[in-house]
Every structure is written in structure tokens, then in C-alpha cells.
Design a protein with these regions (language model features):
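Non-catalytic, surface beta->alpha helical segment in thiol-disulfide oxidoreductase systems
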Residues: 82, 87-122
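Thiol-based oxidoreductase modules, predominantly thioredoxin-like and allied folds used
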Residues: 4, 35, 47-54, 58-73
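Short pre-active-site segment immediately N-terminal to redox-active cysteine/selenocysteine motifs
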Residues: 28-31, 35-39, 82
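Short conserved loop adjoining the S-adenosyl-L-methionine
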Residues: 21, 72-76
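Cys/His/Pro-rich metal-binding microdomains
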Residues: 41-44, 87
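A short beta-strand-turn-helix
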Residues: 5-31
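N-terminal targeting signals for export/organelle localization
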Residues: 1-11, 116-123
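A short glycine-leucine-enriched loop at secondary-structure breakpoints
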Residues: 77-81
Length: 123
């Protein structure tokens, strides 16, 4: 089960915009944040892919979810206008946003290239 973020837990685990003007990731593991809504069909298509990715990458990657209906301030902070929108947050450097119901292979490529996380070998 992926962890859902509120405004408070986002500040604690991802970025405390009250304390920092410039981006500063608070986490110790690269993460993805899925901005979604329960009524969104494409979001429902992406959800099981994200669950699979979390299982496959284990402790090398954290995947969070943000309900855009419930967390409007957080959605506005990132200018979310279409969902699903996924924020890829590396340990160093700026986060990158991707939009739409992307295939698993595209997520895997972004995880490797943007987050610098290699897919673990499953024996």
C-alpha cells in the first residue's frame, strides 16, 4: 500500500516550503509522487502499476500519493491541472513532472534516468 501525503506530511517527508525558498528534498530515498483523484479513470489505470513498481524497487524507491480533491493546496503548489501527474524527486537536483497514464516501461526509464535508481535484479 502506498502512503498518502497530506500538506503536513509532505512538508516533513518531501519539501518544507515554509522553511526553504529553494527546493530541498527532505527524504533519504528517491521518490515519486502520484497526484490523482478517485474519479479519474487514467489514475485508476496507473495505480496498480505504481503498486507493482513499489514492490519491485522496494527500499530503493518511495512512491507517495496525493489526492488532488483532498489536498488542494498541495496540488496548487505544483500547478496540477491534469491528472494523473507524477513528480519524480531525485536525492539531488530538481524534481521533474510527468503527466498522463504512462506505461510501466516509461516509469522504469524515468526511475533510472531521473531518480538514478536501477531496477533490482530479481532472482
Amino acid at each position: 500500500m502506498l502512503e498518502h501525503l497530506t500538506l503536513e506530511t509532505f512538508k516533513e517527508k518531501v519539501f518544507n516550503f515554509d522553511l526553504n525558498k529553494d527546493w530541498k528534498y527532505e527524504g533519504t530515498t528517491p521518490c515519486m509522487i502520484d497526484f490523482y483523484a478517485d474519479w479519474c479513470g487514467p489514475c485508476k489505470m496507473v495505480a496498480p502499476i505504481l503498486e507493482d513498481l513499489q514492490k519491485e524497487y522496494g527500499e530503493n524507491l518511495v512512491i507517495y500519493k496525493v489526492d488532488t480533491e483532498d489536498q488542494r493546496e498541495l496540488s496548487a503548489l505544483f500547478g496540477i491541472q491534469s491528472i494523473p501527474s507524477l513528480l519524480f524527486v531525485p536525492l539531488q537536483g530538481q524534481p521533474q513532472m510527468a503527466m498522463g497514464a504512462l506505461p510501466k516501461s516509461t516509469f522504469e526509464k524515468a526511475i533510472e534516468e531521473v531518480l538514478n535508481v536501477k531496477k533490482p535484479n530479481i532472482n
